[in-house]
Amino acid sequence: MTAARAFLGMSHSPLIGLNPIEPALTRELEDAQARVREQVLAWSPQLVVLIGPDHYNGFFNELMPPFCIGTAATAVGDYGTPAGPLNTDPEAALALAGHLMDEDFDIAVSRRMDVDHGFAQALDVIWGGLATPPLVPIFMNAVAQPGIPRLRRCRALGESIGRFLDGLPRRTLLIGSGGLSHEPPVPTLAHPDPAVRERITVRRTPTQAERDLKTERLKAAGRALAAGDPAMKPLNPDWDARWMDALERGDPGALTALDEDAITREAGLSAHESKTWLVARSALPAGPLPTPVRWYRAIPDFIAGYGLLFSRTDPT
């Protein structure tokens, strides 16, 4: 018998709690998070596989793998998110890595992974911190071309993870953290300032003053987007709805048919984070599944097309 599996697609934003939004929208967001939290805790996963991105806090251009499994991981605590060690399951992580290698995925493995809000915020929303069920963290590069995984590869990875889980008698929750449409001011190697290019290439721990400055710049960018600044790429609720529609009906082929460049053009440079959802959902059977939670709002102050999507399957 194959153990039950569940999927949670969850956007994240470091600006939650930093940039104010309308009280009614705050209540809506908190109510939606409470609903998904209630569903996940009632479902009671025995293992969590979390696919998330990084924002130049743990992975840098000096060595940027498309995907990396962590046997141990520490959250750096950026933007006020929880800091400290994740409750990783190294045996499950290594077994998954071996399975992926056997299925021709040349997967990277980190024995000491650093992660940021791209991982920690999702765990905090559901479990109130980093004290979670046993966890396998999988980093996905979503910012540094040309190594951003393509849609077909994301689907294939998720399907391979699903085959691994077929032989694992544990109720497993797969979380995709990221997206949806958004383009925050994340620097690239095309930046004209060599100091900026160096900062996203070479691993180092920023000072608190540098972190504070980065936070203020991001808060200002959120306010600018909310004010309609033409220099900021707008969110794309229509694109976000199509993405969520495809995953809700269990149709990954509708997403792998998309043009890679169109993701950036239509939804923003950082919308590639949405591929974490595709990886996670592809580990579950195709086709419609019970989906007790779906919620979405475009929230410019957070620079986020913010979505929540929870689906589950029963044992077969």
Each language-model region and where it sits:
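Flexible, D/E/H-enriched segments
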Residues: 1-45, 61-156, 167, 187-316
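Conserved catalytic-core segments centered on acid/base and nucleophilic motifs
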Residues: 164-165, 174
